[in-house]
């Protein structure tokens, strides 16, 4: 009604319904409600978004041994496995300890379409392709870890993320914008709705860029969430 969203239409097992609300919060992750309501947005950087991922966990791991290898050693093993016929598109991988004994979380995949282009999370077909390719890639990295990385010899695939991990899609144009410089400078806000110490990540064609704050954090201003 005018510039105010009064509710949303949904489809479920009982058919089509209207859910009315005093306030509507878009928690879709892709700005679906905002865009359908006409809010301005951008899509990635110059139309290019980051690669998706699919995280999984392995158990029965010798965690101390498995996590003792540095990045260069892991990348060398990936190169060796590729020469042997493995399909391992991501070289810079992260193996992280879990609170559970003998378990490691594996953030190692890079999910693309068959032509190498990133997954467009606003398209149902792309999401389906990503789910299929992601789960196949999980199995390939599982096979690689068991064969090449000491500590994983007896490991088993424990579980896989329930859905594709999307790093980037639409960005709604808010009343304010959280910028890279805000993160670099660890800027605080009088209207913060959250604080974060998580790094800037960029997973694209040029490789992986990550920037970590040193014992500091930045705020996410309320205004960045208002279209």
What function would you assign to each model-found segment?
Residues 2-3, 7, 11-23, 27-227:
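Flavin (FAD/FMN)-binding glycine-rich loop and adjacent Rossmann-like elements that form
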């Amino acid at each position: 009604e005018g510039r105010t969203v009064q509710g949303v239409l949904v489809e479920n097992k009982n058919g089509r319904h209207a859910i009315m609300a005093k306030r509507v919060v878009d928690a879709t992750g892709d700005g679906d409600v905002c865009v359908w309501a006409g809010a301005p947005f951008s899509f990635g950087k110059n139309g290019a978004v980051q690669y998706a991922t699919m995280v999984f966990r392995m158990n029965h791991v010798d965690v101390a041994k498995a996590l003792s290898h540095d990045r260069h050693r892991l990348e060398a093993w990936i190169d060796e496995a590729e020469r042997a016929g493995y399909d391992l598109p991501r070289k810079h991988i992260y193996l992280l300890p879990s609170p559970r004994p003998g378990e490691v979380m594996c953030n190692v995949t890079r999910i693309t379409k068959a032509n190498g282009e990133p997954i467009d999370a606003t398209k149902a077909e792309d999401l389906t392709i990503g789910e299929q390719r992601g789960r196949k890639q999980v199995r390939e990295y599982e096979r690689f870890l068991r064969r090449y990385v000491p500590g994983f010899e007896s490991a088993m695939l424990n579980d896989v993320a329930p859905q594709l991990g999307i790093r980037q899609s639409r960005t709604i144009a808010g009343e304010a914008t959280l910028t890279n410089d805000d993160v670099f400078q660890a800027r605080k806000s009088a209207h913060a709705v959250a604080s974060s110490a998580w790094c800037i990540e960029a997973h694209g064609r040029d490789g992986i860029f990550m920037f970590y704050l040193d014992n500091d954090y930045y705020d996410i201003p309320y205004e960045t969430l208002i279209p």
